[in-house]
Amino acid sequence: MGTPASVVSEPPLWQVSTAQPRDRGRGRKQASANIFQDAELVQIQGLFQRSGDQLAEERAQIIWECAGDHRVAEALRRLRRKRPPRQNHCSRLRVPELGSTAADPQASTTDTASSEQFGNSRRTSARVHRNWNKPGPTGYLHQIRH
């Protein structure tokens, strides 16, 4: 009968890998370590301004001057945008019970006060935990500049 054509023929060009041996098996190019390498200063400033950064111009200038430095790329990976706390987070939502508001107004006042106190203590401890032994975003940039 013979051998099927799919076994005998060469693979299509799109399946042939021209990558180096260590990259075989991957179907795409390696990513750049520094995403700002070919960006213009104005583009970088706009990016920082849209994220709400107060020092957008200074930060953009530092990034633009050090675009090829691998330490800048590492600092950019560590940089995270600070988000304001969400007001209606699911752990802070509270549905009032129907019987408690009319039956005992003193008890509902006590419950509300204790839940507010608990919410404040959770926020404070979360803030302390988040900032514990961790420099701010400016620390990363100053660390690589000096």
UniProtKB/Swiss-Prot annotation:
Per its UniProt entry, which superkingdom is the organism in? Eukaryota
- Entry keyword set: Cell cycle
Location of the region described as Disordered in the Swiss-Prot/TrEMBL record: 1-31, 80-146
Q: Pfam families attached here? A: TC1
Quote the biased-composition stretches of kind Basic residues, using this chain's numbering: 80-92
Asked whether the UniProt record includes Flavoprotein among its keywords, one would answer no
Q: Does the keyword Cell cycle apply?
A: yes
Q: Where is the composition biased (Polar residues)?
A: 106-123
Query: Which is a GO BP term held by this UniProt record?
Result: positive regulation of MAPK cascade
Under PANTHER family, the record lists:
ARGININE VASOPRESSIN-INDUCED PROTEIN 1
Q: What does this protein do?
A: May be involved in MAP kinase activation, epithelial sodium channel (ENaC) down-regulation and cell cycling.
Q: State what protein this is by name.
A: Arginine vasopressin-induced protein 1
What organism is this sequence from? Rattus norvegicus (Rat)
